[in-house]
């Protein structure tokens, strides 16, 4: 029949044939099918004439075909009364064979239930990839749920999970991280339903990755090798009897190559039928050079580079080769993530950390090799052995270990900045800090053994950054996990882990780290030295050593030039000032605490100044997207944040204990009323006073405002109860001692406020009555009254015999108060007129200075001099130069 259809295909007839004939012809000959048919007579003549060139077998088959056609034509003529035979009669002879062929073809495409499940999963994965192109997170969520149900069915049936599932999970994780990074940088945020779907997808994907972390890590290290191995395993498990007819030849060849890769030493299968060179020790340098030349190019596959370098490290048979390959491998891992916002995958980060540990340990065992940033030129493709071929006793390899340590630490910080701090993922990631700390200590020991001063200073600063803001128990836990890192290199500059485990060990460690940085010399050491001082002060303030921290702060004179420092150092400076304020509050030094916190709260941007949040964008904002991006990169990880609610609570309570007596002292005196200690507190208090109805306190600020009102009314018990009910105290170390201290201070402030407010209504008052009213010891009352009299705050005198306080009436009358106000306004008008006169007569200033003048004579005989201001902002300390200088002056006062 094949010869028959080949000849019919050469005809020029014009009628169509059925689709079954096309399939049959495609299977038999592969030639183009006939489109039309001829009448029976002409068709038989054509076939007879065209059989001359065929062999005998073809002739026989053609004759048989012709006979069948003739008989069919005869039957057709009888049915159609001599008319032309229709196409269906021509197809009659081929119909039977077509039916049999179609049955065979149906058998070929029949798939098992297992294959159908695999195809369904592949279809779902394709849908997910299509939805990624349009960022349709709702569809991705739906398809992902269907995919996970299919995977669960596979596991229930104890069947192998296809490799494309792990590929899809890895690609989806990478796409999710990129989308999250773009969303942070985007000016226009995505819609709420899309963002909700994206966050839901993030949680689902995190759970799946955690359940399959080992398999996904193997896939990411060698994607194509993983797929080839999975296909080989799947083929071996299936082992169909008719593999040659059921599977395409190309796929069989790839599977056979994967199964027989050991038979050929020159090539190995990496997937998709591709082949790569098998790396050998002899060709290592050549392969390494080729890999390094491709580094940074746009078409370079970074995963493929990492896989090749990992294979090269396995065939390196000398320390020099091992060092060269690991240096290139770590650099390639850090090149994997080129984005400034997204962070390295955790698996990739951990692999880089292990390789850094490996190369440092290798350099520690082979002291004849060192890694330096600046070395003499050498041939990269030649083995270098110490003392041979013109080499020195110590072979220097070009590289930078400290840069790897810095990048590793930065990537760890970047990951903490991008992970949601309220999830378990953040806690799991934070547990990796002890591994990072071990790597830093190991590198620090190596730099100390090599006497590399600059690298040692940078590594010491990194170590200090990880301990200065932690409590003693956490520092001891970090030091206890060092293990081999402490044994590999014994340090003579810093205390051992055994010494740190003692009671004062953490303080000794921080002091040793800071002392080494203090002694560093050179311009490059200026920044680490400044940061070391600030870290040391922060550590003392964190441990409630207020006077030590204050003295170090003032003696360092950092406040004079901190505006010239970099932004990160200024952020650390702000954190130190705030921590000093908290430390003063814990020690009961209310005034010092308020002064330390005053400046940063006066700005209204506490969160931004402490790098714990970015400024909110509004119509008046001048922050560009680039500046906002830099601010986000400088944000501190969540576990290093200072609780802003606790900080505000401390500031408001300190302001309350200072402002309430000050407001009572001012009374109706217009001059004293201008003395404001805390303007933010005054604004909050005024807002509270304007409220028609005040409900029960709901937050920290409400508690403090109502406590302030109770204190103004002399109700100390209600004030103490409101302050004690604040829930944020549980975050304060030694909260019970702080509450007792505050109760005592509130009683004392209540007594002062009472005396200021009601002294005008008494001629004398008993000390015992005051002690009983405010629940204070009589000796304390006597001491407080004596101090108030000495400071001219209270016009009174003590009568020891009668044990009373006698008040003197020195209040101004209403006329006297109005006269004082008039004098003040007249003085201000005079000063304003003098400034206007100076502005108009500015061109004649030299003549007035030389010849004197009426105004100069009025100024005590000093020609041309300006009149000294009486009172005003200079006398009241309200000039623009207040702020930080006043703060440090207050910090330096004796307590």
Swiss-Prot record:
State the similarity comment: Belongs to the eIF-3 subunit C family.
What residue spans carry the Basic and acidic residues bias annotation?
Answer: 838-860
Oligomeric and partner information:
Component of the eukaryotic translation initiation factor 3 (eIF-3) complex.
Q: Where is the composition biased (Acidic residues)?
A: 11-31, 52-75
Q: Which stretches are tagged as biased composition: Low complexity?
A: 884-895
Give disulfide pairs as residue numbers. none
Subcellular location(s) per record: Cytoplasm
Q: What is its main location?
A: cytoplasm
Q: Hey, what's the signal peptide range on this chain? A: none
Q: Recite the UniProt keywords alphabetically.
A: Cytoplasm, Initiation factor, Protein biosynthesis
Q: Which SUPFAM superfamilies match?
A: Winged helix' DNA-binding domain (SSF46785)
GO-annotated molecular function: RNA binding; translation initiation factor activity; translation initiation factor binding
Quote the Pfam families the UniProt record gives. eIF-3c_N, PCI
The entry's protein name is: Eukaryotic translation initiation factor 3 subunit C
Give the residue ranges for region: Disordered: 1-108, 838-895
Residues annotated as domain PCI: 638-812
Task: Say if the entry is tagged with keyword Ligase.
Answer: no
* Origin species: Mycosarcoma maydis (Corn smut fungus)
Q: Name one GO cellular component term.
A: eukaryotic 48S preinitiation complex
GO biological-process terms attached to the record = formation of cytoplasmic translation initiation complex; translational initiation
Function statement:
Component of the eukaryotic translation initiation factor 3 (eIF-3) complex, which is involved in protein synthesis of a specialized repertoire of mRNAs and, together with other initiation factors, stimulates binding of mRNA and methionyl-tRNAi to the 40S ribosome. The eIF-3 complex specifically targets and initiates translation of a subset of mRNAs involved in cell proliferation.
